Amino acid sequence: SKIKPELNEPDFLGESRECQRVLSYPEAVREALDQALGLDPRVFVMGQGVDDPAGMFGSTLNLHKKSGPGRVFDTPLAETALMGVAAGAAMGGMRPVYFHNRPDFLFLTMDQLVNHASKWSYMFGGEVNVPLVVWACIGRGWGSAAQHSQALQGIFMHVPGLKLVMPSTCYDAKGLLLSAIAD
C-alpha cells in the first residue's frame, strides 16, 4: 500500500496533490539557497563542486551564475582551513553556507567546528554569534566505500552549541535550510 505523508506536500511516489508542485530533494535545497541568497546579501555558499555544471547533484545548479562567483564559489580540498574561513566569516557578520559533500571528512574540521564555532557564544556571554550552516550529504548513492558513507549525526548531536537537523522530506529540507540560514 502507498504511504501518504501527513504534511501538505507531494507524496514519495512523485504524485502531486492538487495544486501542489512536485520537487525533488535537490530542487528543494536549491530553491532554499536561491531564496536565502536573494533575501540577504550576507549569505554566501562555498564548498567543493558548488559551481560544478551538475551543481552538487542539482542542489546548487547555476546559483553561481545567478548570484555571482563572489557569493557561490568552489573551494579547494582543505577542510580544516575552510571551516575556519566559514566560521571567521560568520563571526564577521556574514552568513556562510558551507557545503561539505562528505560527512566523513567533517572530522578534519572538528577543532574549528567543535572547539571554536560551536562555543564562541558561550565563551563570550552571548556577545559573539557564529551563524554558520554546514550542509553535509549523507547516503547519496552506491559505491561510496568506508570513508565516504558514514552517518555521523550521532556524534554531532552531542556537541553543545551545534544545532543538528536531518530533513527527510523535500518540504522539510527547504524549510529547515531557510530557517538554519536565518537563525
Which residues are covered by each model-predicted region?
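Thiamine diphosphate
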Residues: 2-183
